[in-house]
Amino acid sequence: MQDIAYADQLRLKHQRVSQALETVGIELADPVVPLADPWRYRNKAELTFGTARALGAVDALTVGYHEAGSYWRVVDIDECLLMPAPVAPVVRTMRELCRATGLPAYRQKTHEGFFRHLLIRHSRTRQTSLVALITTPGNDAVIRNLFETLLKREPSVSSAYWGISESLADVAYPQTLIHLGGSPSLEDRVNRFQIRLLPFSFLQPSTEQAERIYQQLVEWSGTGAIAWDLYCGLGLIGLHLSEAYQKVYGIDVESDHLSLARTHAAMNGVSNVEFRAGKAEELLQDRRFWLQEARPNLAVVDPPRSGLHPQVIATLLGARPERIAYLSCNVNSLAKDLKELFSGFPRYRATRVKAFDMFPQTHHVETLVLLERN
């Protein structure tokens, strides 16, 4: 959507969310909450290595994004306007250093080659970056020398990782991850909470917009004894609720996320948030605990794009919280789940709804809905 004026992007997103929510009787009255600057908002870039035929018929290593409509061709980039400006020189230096090795890019068609992906995370508060280079196995000394040079040339790079992947799939996540220099994590802040990020930690793409969403959630959530934070990730929603609720329970399937969530609670002096590892639909089957000892006043859900598991919906209805806050990155899944929640017992009604432009220049949008029990 980069060829569409930002005001028009927001109108299109409002229309899309409105149409989906109207199917369950919800009106989106407020405009979509914009970003002050719809450019350079992303805190993470995942680039792909490829090969381009250069002048003189010499194959040149490229690093960038897949060409529109092509699975195989990678467009070489010097700069991405969705990423903070300090990331661009790091990309250029990494491309130069990788080319200097003479090693080829990985080819998905033949499953041959070496360089696969380049991941860069940027800290808004520290103005530093974490760099992770994903390759196939081998060339240990070459990679260590490469990162030694990178850390000398780019002082903004505060953390360096080497990921090794033998997967046939074209995904950035490696089977092995080795810390090669700098700090083990990237430090940043979301509202008043200090956080630490690893290469594959999940954080909303725009830290600025995430802060607005969490502030809005706290404003809507009131106070109470117990809150649930389902699909809690790094624990940020739970931390934001910790001042208003006596006890917060966070659930997530990713143990790495929960390890950082516990670290974040300790770093920020929060002692009333408890994190549990597992699938929400499985952990919540302990009805004696969740529906009696830990029965919530508030349940917050932030599920993946596919939405809520039917068992989670059933448990939410069985727990009868006074309020349910649903944060969604897929308004169609949101509407589907709301239909199930509205048709169950006890009866819930939507009392607040707001859409946030988390992803300018794309069609994606975040939607926050507050349900209250009749």
Set out the residue ranges of the language-model regions.
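Extended interfacial segments that mediate partner engagement and assembly in macromolecular machines
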Residues: 1-107, 125, 140
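Solvent-exposed residues in well-ordered beta-strands and their adjoining turns
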Residues: 48-52, 68, 121, 134-136, ...
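Short, acidic/hydrophobic/Gly-rich beta-strand patch recurrent on exposed beta strands
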Residues: 62-67, 132-134, 261
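Short edge beta-strands and adjacent turn/loop segments
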Residues: 112-125
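Short, aliphatic-rich beta-strand segments
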Residues: 120, 127-136, 194-198, 298
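Conserved loop-to-beta-strand segment in the C-terminal subdomain of adenylate-forming
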Residues: 126-130, 363-366
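Rossmann-like S-adenosyl-L-methionine
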Residues: 141-374
